[in-house]
Amino acid sequence: MAEKKKILIVEDDPNFGSILKDYLKLHSYDVSLAKNGIEGLEKFKKTSYDLCILDVMMPFKDGFSLATDIRSLNEEIPLIFLTAKSLKEDVINGFKIGADDYLIKPFDSEILLLKGRSIFKRN
């Protein structure tokens, strides 16, 4: 049996983070949740993940800074931003940092699931 893909979610809204974590677990992923960018970076350093899903607007360390730190540790890890920041400049910045995708809240959970599967097929 194939090993479950490990996903790190970094999201400061505890309700949203919990719902997203449960949804992905329901689809057979091994999911960790961090409540801010600092906690997310610590979890990333301790565990080998297959995908990171990052909010942008968070206390202590925003998602763009976190993504830059993650990229300095692992250039290949797939990153998806999942955020309410919808300005063109934010989307462009996300991709310049190295995002594989950028989804704007509110979003369709099935689309996130399909984007994740697509990333896993390529990697």
Map each language-model feature to its residues.
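Conserved acidic carboxylate
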Residues: 11
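Two-component/phosphorelay signaling modules centered on CheY-like receiver
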Residues: 14-32
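Acidic catalytic/metal-coordinating carboxylates
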Residues: 36-39, 62-65
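Active-site beta3 strand of CheY-like receiver
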Residues: 47-53
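C-terminal output helix
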Residues: 107-116
